[in-house]
Amino acid sequence: MKWKVQLYVGGTTFYENVHAVNRLDAIETAKARNPKARVIATNPDLSS
């Protein structure tokens, strides 16, 4: 499943789209790509 993780770093917010089985794996993947970022929101991406 695709997840849309909203991250915050350096005064800006941005989205990271990741493929993960569940919400916690999506957050872990997004944090691995952006270790200094803070997670704001995590939502499933239902668009095809």
What function would you assign to each model-found segment?
Residues 1-2, 30-33:
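Secondary-structure boundary/capping motif
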Residues 1-13:
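Short aromatic-glycine-(Arg/Gly/Cys) micro-motifs in beta-strand/loop hairpins
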Residues 5-7, 20, 39:
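Hydrophobic beta-strand residues in large extracellular and virion-surface proteins
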Residues 12-22:
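A short, exposed loop/beta-hairpin motif centered on an aromatic-Gly-Thr core
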Residues 15, 28, 40:
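Short acidic, gly/pro-rich beta-turn/loop elements at beta-sheet edges
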Residues 33-48:
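Short, mixed-charge low-complexity intrinsically disordered segments
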